Amino acid sequence: MGKIIGIDLGTTNSCVAVLDGGKARVLENAEGDRTTPSIIAYTDDETIVGSPAKRQAVTNPTNTFFAIKRLIGRRFKDDEVQRDVNIMPFKIIAADNGDAWVESRGNKMAPPQVSAEILKKMKKTAEDFLGEEVTEAVITVPAYFNDSQRQATKDAGRIAGLDVKRIINEPTAAALAYGIDKKQGDNIVAVYDLGGGTFDISIIEIDSNDGDQTFEVLATNGDTHLGGEDFDNRLINYLADEFKKEQGLDLRKDPLAMQRLKEAAEKAKIELSSTNHTEVNLPYITADATGPKHLVIKITRAKLESLVEDLIIRTLEPLKVALADADLSVTDINEVILVGGQTRMPKVQEAVTNFFGKEPRKDVNPDEAVAVGAAIQAGVLSGDVKDVLLLDVTPLSLGIETMGSVMTKLIEKNTTIPTKAQQVFSTADDNQSAVTIHVLQGERKQASANKSLGQFNLDGIEPAQRGQPQIEVMFDIDADGILHVSATDKKTGKKQNITIKASSGLSEEEVAQMVRDAEAHADEDKKFEELVQSRNQADGLVHATKKQVEEAGDALPSEDKEKIQAAMDAVDTAIKGNDKEAIEKATQELIEASAKLMEIAQAKSQAQGGDNADAGKQANATADDVVDAEFEEVKDDKK
């Protein structure tokens, strides 16, 4: 059986880890980095992922996608999506089913399809390290992700060619990474996870006893649309407003300028975590009739903190709710762990310290802990890690819509998963022959105020007065936090059961098509790589041949020179095209045309070898005249 890898599919950065010699190891990508920017760019002939995509974003802003995780499993009309529509340089559109999709070069794409490109890079990184094909993975998601978002993440894995063995919550993964070596005693840990696009708080009890470890999530809460991207946007808007005041020009109308501004704002935010002031300097940011304009604005740490203060305060309310749900107070928390790049901001650390009354731990890498935890969970599933039990929870309550548009809960939030629950319902009207089961997720009493996960019908109910038929509804949540629902007419035994797929989301056919597309692109990518390799080899041969022609000088007959030049011209022409076979044919013809050149080079080399041999003989003759002296070691006479 091959290795199961652990992937942290992040909003801003992604990371992959694998168990190596019993320890989780974070892997370096092809660029030599341990984390990969979650950025995907589409050009005319290729898909670019990670740092190379980030580098070209300024020149290709409308086809470079970042923070796609904020759209995964969401509807276009969602308030959170509408906020992003107005600030993202790329196009966010409504799919036929109402989902939020993106568009590049006329192609409409679902977020799982785009996210799959990042997962493919993580898969390739692991394969390069392991030297074998990887087909299975554990992928992390924010603890507060709903059912639709979890399903969409699994779809992304499938499109990338991965069998997702488990979806694990990010704070739980971080707790695994922290606690796996803590072998004795009980600890109650608060994991504060403020990443690029999401915020989670999980209260986790780690029980270590005689080598056995149990990680039990007591409560979780959060906000799936609050993270470092929002901090960046506050700074971007401030810089754009300041520039408009000074120059009278609105940079928000210029995608190219906004992409440069985004990069500069992110850099300034990071710098202000270690310094008290910095300067954003962007020459030639835009131009008007009077000429080019430059943006030069000084930012202090205090200014940044004032811009994002309310965002930091927003993270504190879920902390209070999670503690209340776990029936704990801040004094019950033994350790606080910070996860996610945004927790490097001193003001965030200060807020967490003040809330819990203790300093967070500094020995957990906020960028890598989640991937490490995913790799450990992968080890648990494969049997490589023993004596570890992980008890996670469902973040939101689950139920169905009942008479009066009320949500009746079957499974309360923070229930340990996997779990089952059932309840008997009846009909609302006389002689009702069918019932609609409308499945909801959320905490509100009013059905319409909660997230609709989908609905299905149970028909064939025997006619009877209202309230008499007995319909048993069963909810079954698996270890991934994904819901399966069944409804049974207890009198007839007729049953209808489904895995909940939201009214949004990708159908099986769509996912299958995207898998086929990804496989086709894999072939295309391989062909493109081979084409580039052939071009590079041909170009290198032309360069080397030119040099040899110059070195040969008059020793090369003019007839051969003309033949070689014609062959080099043919290679140059072939390189400009996309026909690999034509390039290889032209390359071979150049090698054959250069036969005389090779003879001259070999003759010259042999002549040089003869000269060197003569020089060697002379050196030996000189050496023969040297008389060896006899030296004695003189030792100090120490008395």
Swiss-Prot record:
For this protein, the record's InterPro entries field holds: ATPase_NBD, Chaperone_DnaK, Heat_shock_70_CS, HSP70_C_sf, HSP70_peptide-bd_sf, Hsp_70_fam
Q: What is this protein called?
A: Chaperone protein DnaK
What is the organism field in this record?
A: Shewanella baltica (strain OS195)
Regarding protein family, the annotation reads:
Belongs to the heat shock protein 70 family.
Q: Which Gene3D superfamilies match?
A: 1.20.1270.10, 3.30.420.40, Actin, Chain A, domain 4, Substrate Binding Domain Of DNAk, Chain A, domain 1
Which gene is the coding source of this polypeptide chain?
Answer: dnaK
Write one Gene Ontology MF term.
ATP-dependent protein folding chaperone
Q: Where is this region: Disordered?
A: 602-639
**Name of one Pfam family that matches:** HSP70
- PTM-bearing positions, type Phosphothreonine: T198
Please state, per the UniProt record, what induces or represses the expression of this protein: By stress conditions e.g. heat shock.
Q: Enumerate the UniProt keywords alphabetically.
A: ATP-binding, Chaperone, Nucleotide-binding, Phosphoprotein, Stress response
